[in-house]
Amino acid sequence: MTPAAVLSAASGVALVLLSLALLLTVLRIIRGPTLPDRVLGLDMLVAIAIGLIAVIAVRTGFYLYIDIAIALGLVGFLATVAFARFILARGLSPERRTPGTTEIPQAKPRPSQAGRRKRKGAR
């Protein structure tokens, strides 16, 4: 077997397996019982699409596809961060939200180490 034949066979198997994974991930997105399940499915879908693009780039020899895969990875990451912020903001109780803003409230600052030492010594 020549190296070209091995590469062709390996890329064919990879395309079949990635296509199957893509199909199963789409089913998980559709049937996902909760919103975080769907967000995780979308993130996995982006990762599988990046793999498909990379295999197609190797198979065709048109390596500009790798740049497209990198851009898709960046967009997928930003989408995941946006969905996470949406889920976090949606889960806050109404009294913790600041009316008229989309900012997520920050936690209260903890006392400094110096303040703790003073309290320990005072006991």
From Swiss-Prot:
Belongs to the CPA3 antiporters (TC 2.A.63) subunit F family. GO terms for cellular component: plasma membrane. Pfam families: MrpF_PhaF. Residues 95-123 are annotated as: Disordered. This is PhaF2 protein. It is a multi-pass membrane protein. Keywords: Cell membrane, Membrane, Transmembrane, Transmembrane helix, Transport. The keyword NAD does not apply. GO terms for molecular function: sodium:proton antiporter activity. Coiled coil: none annotated. The chain crosses the membrane at residues 4-24, 38-58, 64-84. InterPro entries: MrpF/PhaF-like. NCBIfam families: PRK12599.1-4 (NF009245). It is found in: Cell membrane. The gene is phaF2.
